[in-house]
């Protein structure tokens, strides 16, 4: 849970400040500015994969052999990367105009950390703490809850416990956020460069 959340949080925070931190280079040389967001995502992905190397011996030590559920891992990593990058497309543009956006993102991530199943299973929330009629709303409003659960299930071999409809809505919303963020970034990047 913590490694997945860290991947998401660092991708989003560093993506938010990527244009501002590279303003000198951006103003001198033109190349696609999305590269700055993607480079942060790629760097954090490498860090996540290197951190996972430590997890593998621990899994064997505790008798957790890989199952077919391990296929959730690449899907969850891809979706977390898309979600973080999509949000970073929005926040990086806003950061060029509103310099406190980085701090707003940091506070939002701290709140999201406690609202997401980082240190606990999703069952602990959905099994009584949240009324059944609000469980779907919780999963729709917090895609990271689904993705953290997918990562956990990938390594523990437990069933996902999220129905296909909720999973489809969460994945669709992530793809939509990514596409809208990308379009917003493309439309506003020239104006953002002037704000640097």
Language model: regions and residue ranges:
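Alpha-helical transmembrane segments and their short interhelical loops
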Residues: 33, 39-108, 161-183
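Transmembrane helix boundary and interhelical loop/hinge segments in multi-pass membrane proteins
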Residues: 7-33, 38-45
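Hydrophobic alpha-helical transmembrane segments
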Residues: 14-29, 49-58, 109-126
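Hydrophobic alpha-helical segments of integral membrane proteins
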Residues: 22, 38-42, 101-104, 108, ...
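Short cytosolic juxtamembrane segments of multi-pass membrane proteins
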Residues: 100, 186-196
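Transmembrane alpha-helical segments that form the membrane-embedded catalytic/substrate-channel core
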Residues: 3-15, 81-94, 114-123, 179-184
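Short alpha-helical transmembrane interface motifs in multi-pass membrane proteins
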Residues: 4-9, 38-39, 68-76, 134-137
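Short hydrophobic, aromatic-rich alpha-helical segments embedded in or entering the lipid bilayer
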Residues: 114-159, 163-168
């Amino acid at each position: 849970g913590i490694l997945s959340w860290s991947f998401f949080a660092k991708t989003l925070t560093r993506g938010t400040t990527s244009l501002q931190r590279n303003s000198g280079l951006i103003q001198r040389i033109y190349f696609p500015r999305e590269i700055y967001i993607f480079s942060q995502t790629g760097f954090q992905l490498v860090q996540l994969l290197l951190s996972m190397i430590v997890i593998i011996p621990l899994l064997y030590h505790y008798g957790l052999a890989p199952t077919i559920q391990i296929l959730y891992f690449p899907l969850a990593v891809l979706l977390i990367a898309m979600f973080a990058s999509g949000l970073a497309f929005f926040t990086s543009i806003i950061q060029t105009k509103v310099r406190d956006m980085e701090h707003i993102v940091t506070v939002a991530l701290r709140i999201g950390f406690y609202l997401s199943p980082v240190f606990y299973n999703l069952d602990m929330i959905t099994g009584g703490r949240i009324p059944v009629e609000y469980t779907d709303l919780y999963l729709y409003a917090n895609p990271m809850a689904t993705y953290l659960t997918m990562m956990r299930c990938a390594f523990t071999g437990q069933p996902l416990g999220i129905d296909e409809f909720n999973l489809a809505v969460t994945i669709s919303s992530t793809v939509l956020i990514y596409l809208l963020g990308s379009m917003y970034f493309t439309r506003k990047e020239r104006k953002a460069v002037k704000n640097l």
